[in-house]
Amino acid sequence: MEDMRIATLTSGGDCPGLNAVIRGIVRTASNEFGSTVVGYQDGWEGLLGDRRVQLYDDEDIDRILLRGGTILGTGRLHPDKFKAGIDQIKANLEDAGIDALIPIGGEGTLKGAKWLSDNGIPVVGVPKTIDNDVNGTDFTFGFDTAVAVATDAVDRLHTTAESHNRVMIVEVMGRHVGWIALHAGMAGGAHYTVIPEVPFDIAEICKAMERRFQMGEKYGIIVVAEGALPREGTMELREGHIDQFGHKTFTGIGQQIADEIHVRLGHDVRTTVLGHIQRGGTPTAFDRVLATRYGVRAARACHEGSFDKVVALKGESIEMITFEEAVGTLKEVPFERWVTAQAMFG
């Protein structure tokens, strides 16, 4: 199909590489097919409120490759409000003459995209998350940048921990999966890594740290994913609360582990929570390339009429997978990967 009118939007948390996807969509649609691209602002809210801008293949689009965040803005929308607005969404897309929609987002966004597809809207999804937890794709863009940021923090904390004879805990993002923690811990030479997929025993962590000190190593680095949980009966956690989207908020698992280590071993323990710094800034070269390839493939899929699909990285190829494969389950860290990392502990 030629001369289409394609819409795109970014939803959920911001992520390095979003602008590269937008750029890939716009340049491919314009240069290869002579099509027009419209961007809805602030995610699903913008689609519901019909807040849109036309995206031109000009210098402004060319320059966004290096920028973090998203030029369209992003946000979250409660699923109930989203589903209640289906008639308005259809009307807005029809009034704007939209032939296809490319939502860019994580698991929640892709579930919303699937629901729109099930309701007759031509959709091609693009997976986005620094957590790397979308199933069916080898990597999501944003993950490499987040790992680079976390690894840099771990690298820097080695010297300060050693100078002060401290145990340093680095808490990274990862509510349900530990890909960032696993990779940053291994790349940064952490002495213990804690991930949600493997409930931890605080006694084992303490033994690993004490063993280091007994061997004459007067410091330790522990990388902890924010969603890590203790093995049942080994440590009592301070409770968080549930936010408006049904997500559990955390009271700082890194600090709770730090407090336990201090009480049990008496060592000076400090915690660094990286938080949203992992989402910001210029994307790495890997993420720019991957995000660009996602945008190009998504635009081509629209012109091929290949809807109700999600772009995905399989080996070296960008392929199309079903929404069911992408959102059916989270891509967790396999236990054997954690065992490999465990060999580097201590």
Swiss-Prot record:
It catalyses: beta-D-fructose 6-phosphate + ATP = beta-D-fructose 1,6-bisphosphate + ADP + H(+). The active site is at 131 (proton acceptor). It is found in: Cytoplasm. Its cofactor is Mg(2+). InterPro entries: ATP_PFK, ATP_PFK_prok-type, Phosphofructokinase_CS, Phosphofructokinase_dom, Phosphofructokinase_III, PKF_sf. PROSITE patterns: PHOSPHOFRUCTOKINASE. One of its GO terms (cellular component) is 6-phosphofructokinase complex. Pathway: Carbohydrate degradation; glycolysis; D-glyceraldehyde 3-phosphate and glycerone phosphate from D-glucose: step 3/4. Substrate binds at residues 129-131, 166, 173-175, 226, 270, 276-279. ATP binds at residues 13, 76-77, 106-109. Keywords: ATP-binding, Cytoplasm, Glycolysis, Kinase, Magnesium, Metal-binding, Nucleotide-binding, Transferase. Its EC number is 2.7.1.11. The record marks 108 as: Important for substrate specificity. It is an enzyme of class 2 (transferase). One of its GO terms (biological process) is fructose 1,6-bisphosphate metabolic process. This is ATP-dependent 6-phosphofructokinase. The lineage of its organism: Bacteria, Bacillati, Actinomycetota, Actinomycetes, Mycobacteriales.
